[in-house]
Amino acid sequence: MRQAEITRNTLETQITVRLNLDGTGQGKYATGVPFLDHMLDQIARHGLIDLDIEAKGDLHIDAHHTVEDIGITFGQALAKAWGDKKGLTRYGHSYVPLDEALSRVVIDLSGRPGLELHVEFTRAVIGTFDVDLVGEFFHGLVNHAGMTLHIDNLRGKNAHHQAETIFKAFGRALRMAVTPDPRMAGTMPSTKGSL
């Protein structure tokens, strides 16, 4: 079973992430950041992973530490769940539209953390959610999952739609990248022999 549970406790946050890469898209979220809960649900549903995230953070200051640390813990859980990566597809990509918005996400489970995030949100806040936190979440995730991630919002006028297409496309690209390829069973998906 490709499952993981990671708990991360700091002076700023206490976070537990449980996930199953071979799930059905079920999720439970108690982060204290409602818009992030909505975005995490997009990852789970479109990635077909079961995801349970509990977080307590210093939200009396703002959501920065909580969102970043959820990304870190989620990345650690992903790395633990996919293990040595033998037999995985490794690469994943997706285009997702939502009305006027369109985003493209491309993933490489390379072991080399890197984020290329290209989005110009049409407003600075979605509800009470600072759009800068989208980048903080994905930076934390890629650094601890060891993946290269390219995110491009190709168009969009509604900031909620821009964010939602990014998270949906990430879920779908992740699903592709972590899918076992039966022709690669037991084989590392790299000419170097390691990732």
Curated annotation (Swiss-Prot):
Pathway note: Amino-acid biosynthesis; L-histidine biosynthesis; L-histidine from 5-phospho-alpha-D-ribose 1-diphosphate: step 6/9
Catalytic activity: D-erythro-1-(imidazol-4-yl)glycerol 3-phosphate = 3-(imidazol-4-yl)-2-oxopropyl phosphate + H2O
Keywords recorded for this protein, A-Z: Amino-acid biosynthesis, Cytoplasm, Histidine biosynthesis, Lyase
The species this protein was found in: Dechloromonas aromatica (strain RCB)
TM helices/strands, residue ranges: none
NCBIfam families: PRK00951.1-1, PRK00951.1-5, PRK00951.2-1, PRK00951.2-4
GO CC term (a single one): cytoplasm
GO biological process: L-histidine biosynthetic process
HAMAP family per record: HisB (MF_00076)
Predominant location category: cytoplasm
Protein name: Imidazoleglycerol-phosphate dehydratase
A GO term for molecular function: imidazoleglycerol-phosphate dehydratase activity
Top EC class, one word: lyase
